[in-house]
Amino acid sequence: MSEKLQVVTLLGSLRKGSFNGMVARTLPKIAPASMEVNALPSIADIPLYDADVQQEDGFPATVEALAEQIRQADGVVIVTPEYNYSVPGGLKNAIDWLSRLPDQPLAGKPVLIQTSSMGVIGGARCQYHLRQILVFLDAMVMNKPEFMGGVIQNKVDPQTGEVIDQGTLDHLT
């Protein structure tokens, strides 16, 4: 019997009641038996990228730890909202820090992007921008399956913090 595929989720939202957080927390429960899905630490504690700080102080411990967990994983699922037609600032900041590391954690790594929003197109514009960023970092961005969860607020249970809409669950699996 082979080892389970190790996949980590990177949440692009900092909000406590994040719908994307609910999607991310649902993934380990619906993953196939051959896959283990674990959440990466929150990106909330990563300071704003500053090349002067990097040169003087090196990389923050939060960035080093995040990078190591990504390196150890077989793949990454980025679960994120769309802010102002693009990538949330916190997620872009985390990626900016990761991109400066000499041993690139995302290079050659399979990455799947999942976006959700309260609007009907489910974060599609964010996906396009995020793909451009990740391709530059030599990540192996998966073209399919695409998940853009539109009107996500109607597909989750805010009490349990999980996706409850069967069509959405089917699409996620």
Where on the chain are the PLM-derived regions?
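N-terminal beta1-alpha1 ligand-phosphate binding loop
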Residues: 2-35
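Glycine-rich phosphate/pyrophosphate-binding loop and the adjoining helix
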Residues: 2-8, 140-173
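Cofactor-binding loop segments of dinucleotide-utilizing enzymes, especially the Rossmann-like FAD-
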Residues: 12, 42, 116
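A generic structural motif
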Residues: 32-38, 139-140
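Hydrophobic/aromatic beta-strand patches that form the interior of the parallel beta-sheet core
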Residues: 38, 112-114, 142, 147
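N-terminal beta-loop-helix "entrance" segment that forms/cooperates
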Residues: 42-59, 157
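Helix-loop-strand module that forms the ligand-binding subsite of alpha/beta enzymes
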Residues: 58-138
